[in-house]
Amino acid sequence: MVMKLAPYGVFCLTARTFSGIGFDAFLPLLKYMAGVMTALAIQGLVVYMAILKGFTGLSPVRFLKKFLPVMGFAFSTATSNATIPMSIDTLNKKMGVSKQISSFTIPLGATINMDGTSIMQGVAVIFIAEAYGIHLTPANLATVVVTATLASIGTAGIPSVGLVTLAMVLNSVGLPTEGIALIMGIDRILDMLRTAVNITGDAVCTTIVSHQEKALNREVFNRN
């Protein structure tokens, strides 16, 4: 009952805050969201697709068209683990990827390949540092890159787990973990997006491995 009513309570509190302090107070959060969304879009639609094309010669457009339902499911559930069966089935039946390979790489990727989470944490650290007026040196930024990467490896594929590991990243550069509260209210939307990016990366890597192992049926992939 509490979980069902909580969103309404949060909405009322947000509406009250909005009416009291105005729209300007939300501009930094909107910029943060825009920054994360832009980075995720570049990773999912540019970087991954360029890697797919470069290593396999397959059409990125056809790949996205066939994998879009899986991305939509991942977006709605915000969990990589729940998407595993659908990813394996889609790769096998619609893209010609070996099920023997996908049954290994997709669950593995759902555990260690959290690019979207790393991206969010990098942007979040910069946002929180600016909110507290703390300057980050190049050495601090390098530490964030390494820590965010390590924190994403082995992270459970469940909703909002990135906020939990973000605390470790903040501690690595001496930022207050209380800053997580600044972005907690809007993280659900970003969590859904980064989950879609994460599982897309898993699928791209699986397709590449299947191609390199000569276990990719191109006729199935090119079939409408």
Locate predicted features.
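Membrane-interfacial loop-to-helix junctions in multi-pass transporters
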Residues: 1-5, 38-40, 56-63, 95-102, ...
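Signature of multi-pass transmembrane helix bundles
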Residues: 1-62, 219, 223-224
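Transmembrane alpha-helical segments and their short flanking loops
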Residues: 122-224
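Alpha-helical transmembrane segments and their lipid-water interface positions
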Residues: 3-11, 47, 117-121, 194-195, ...
